[in-house]
C-alpha cells in the first residue's frame, strides 16, 4: 500500500490535486487540519477514512464539523486505528523491490505539484 505525501502549505487546491490524482482512500493528518478537509473532499470522493495524530490535542467540534460535511467518512485517532489492527490481525505481505512505496509530491513552487514515484528499492537504497 503506497503512501502519498502532500504539503498542507499548498492549500486546498494542492491537496485536491494530489487526492484526485492518486485516488487516495485514507488520509493521515494532525488534528488541527481536520476542518481543512471539508472543501477538498467535496471534489475528491475517494477518501473513506481520516486518521488523526493521537499525540496532539483534538477539538471534538472539528471532528463533528467534518463528519457533518461528509457523513460517509470514518474518522479515527491513530490509537483507535492501532487498536483495530491489534484486534484484527492479518498475515503480513512483504513488499517487493519493484512495488510502489511512496508518491512524494513536490512543493509546487513552479506550478502544480508533481508526484514523484518511489519504489521500495529506492527508499531502501536511500536509507543509511
Please name every model-derived segment.
Residues 2-80:
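Structural core segment of the AMP-binding/adenylate-forming
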Residues 6, 10, 94, 114-121:
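Alpha-helix capping and helix-loop boundary segments enriched in small/acidic/polar residues
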Residues 11-14, 85, 108-111, 115:
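Residue-identity detector for glycine
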Residues 35, 83, 124-125:
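Active-site micro-motifs of SAM-dependent methyltransferase domains
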Residues 73-76, 83-105, 112:
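Conserved pre-ATP/AMP-binding loop-to-beta segment of ANL
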Residues 101-125:
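Conserved AMP-binding A3 loop
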